[in-house]
Amino acid sequence: KFFGTAQDHKRVKENDLGPNTGGMGAYSPANIVNKLIKKKIISRIVKPTLHALKKKNNPYRGFLYIGLMIKNNNPYLIEFNVRMGDPECQVILPRLKSDIVKIFYNAVNNNLKKTKIEWKKIRV
């Protein structure tokens, strides 16, 4: 399941200046991820990754944080993490309307396909 988007700000100074940090703040949903880019992320990154894991008999259940750079409407993979990103989770979770414990339970029990994940129509 696609679990929402966020965009963080890495630079220490305003206007994207200064050295990189672990994240100076974030907002969600990420404006840059439109329907076309989301489709590209899923088809070019998510599906091939999950297919490769399954092919190696190593199916994955849990968060797969995908750190991206988007340039000219194309997503480029920077990193994977098997946890939510910080500060991204701080702006994604307040938007979650569904019960997160139920989502985790269904993920552990390989039942996410039937799990409906609903979002509040807010920006954080």
Language-model segments: which ranges?
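Internal nucleotide-binding/catalytic subdomain
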Residues: 1-87
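Poly-acidic low-complexity segments
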Residues: 8, 91, 99-103, 118
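Functionally constrained cores in energy, signaling, and assembly domains
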Residues: 38, 49, 95, 107, ...
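ATP-dependent carboxylate-activation loops
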Residues: 83-99
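A glycine-rich beta-turn/hairpin centered on an aromatic-Pro dipeptide
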Residues: 104-124
